[in-house]
Amino acid sequence: MNTLLVGINVAVMLILVGVLYYMQRKHVSFNKRVFTALGVGILFGLILQFIYEPTSKVIIESNTWFGLIGNGYVKLLQMIVMPLILVSIISAFTKLQLTKNLGKISGLIIGILILTTGIAAAVGIAASAGFDVSATGLQQGDAESARLKLVEERFTSIEKTTIPDKLLELLPTNPFLDLTGARPTSTISVVIFAAFIGIAFIGVKRKYPEQAELFKKMLDAVYAIVMRMVTLILRLTPYGVLALMAKTVAGSDINAILKLGNFVLASYVALIVMFIIHLLLIALSGLNPIQYLKKVFPVLTFAFTSRSSAGAMPLNIEAQKEKLGISEGIANFAASFGVSIGQNGCAGIYPAMLAMMVAPTVGIDPLQPQFILTLIAVVAISSFGVAGVGGGATFAALIVLSTMNLPIGIVALVISVEPLIDMGRTALNVSGSMTAGLISSKWLGELDQDTYNQDDTKTGEIAS
């Protein structure tokens, strides 16, 4: 019987995929197809929630099949992320206008990312205090116990590592290993490796311009191929969003969410407030924040459903260049740095809120100014090297909690609402990187304001 029901669910999913394909054949815009997929995915997931239990075998098996589309799409994006970072960063160095302001551009982008992460930590602290979020009374079930075991294993490798050692881990000892994403800090290690190649290119360009020009032409060819691969993968975005949203909604435990409702509410209030701060920073830079919101919404939608900052990177770069008018070099830097440095959601708000929740359980007053200032500083510093894939928030939280000498068990106790909160965190991460790129480009006079201010006519070109 279960097999029949699973077959029906999968058949409905395939019909919905067929509808999206029909819309594509009728040249319906990319935005409309993505939003249609988002809405239909939520509706389908809610229907499955109503008919079955989230933990039922039918839902579990159906979600496994849905994952072929949703998770398969995310894996394709993750497949291209490391090559894209490597080629994008090196390509940024080969742009003449970038080499003149290299230190200023990279410093400004990183500075904005770290600053906004510190602000995000303060927002998370305020939300925790305002909603009186506490770890008291949280119960540990089977899922939490299993998660706690994994967290403790991961903590063992982090606990004995000092802050200088953590910073040393950012340096790539084997760049080819890091290109596989084998370490939590692999992303930023690839960024550093690519930056060294770029700096070497600048030196070669001064002494041996012919060899440098040959390298540049080869790199341009590789970059064109990588971006073509990105385009091919991005065509699948509506289908991926449909499956991911249906899977997430269908598998969500409503009862568990209600038990941690205060934490979920406080988290989303903090995320929304921080997103508004992004818009305020854009407005203070002399740009229309509504225009920004309209142009990046499809990217944020995908980040929300996929829960992968790294997976959203191709869309991130494309949106910065084609929609916001950000120069290619700055867009490449901002997107690449943004998946490993200063993630406002995963490395900012989340660790700060967990620290505020657990501090009273060990006799610490979380509202003491000294504790708050120390926590903000630790969060900002610890935001270096957080992976832009699943588990990055856990890694950031473990570093912050261990540095503050706080219990790490809280990380496991909120597992039931982790997927729900992670969607919002990821969207904020991506918004933070695009905000850093936009503000940097504006301040350095490299923003094409005509592109930024014009109506969004290029949306469909992302998947063309």
Curated annotation (Swiss-Prot):
SUPFAM superfamilies: Proton glutamate symport protein (SSF118215). GO terms for cellular component: plasma membrane. InterPro entries: Na-dicarboxylate_symporter (IPR001991), Na:dicarbo_symporter_sf (IPR036458). It is a multi-pass membrane protein. One of its GO terms (molecular function) is L-cystine transmembrane transporter activity. Mediates uptake of L-cystine, the oxidized form of L-cysteine. This is L-cystine uptake protein TcyP. The lineage of its organism: Bacteria, Bacillati, Bacillota, Bacilli, Bacillales.
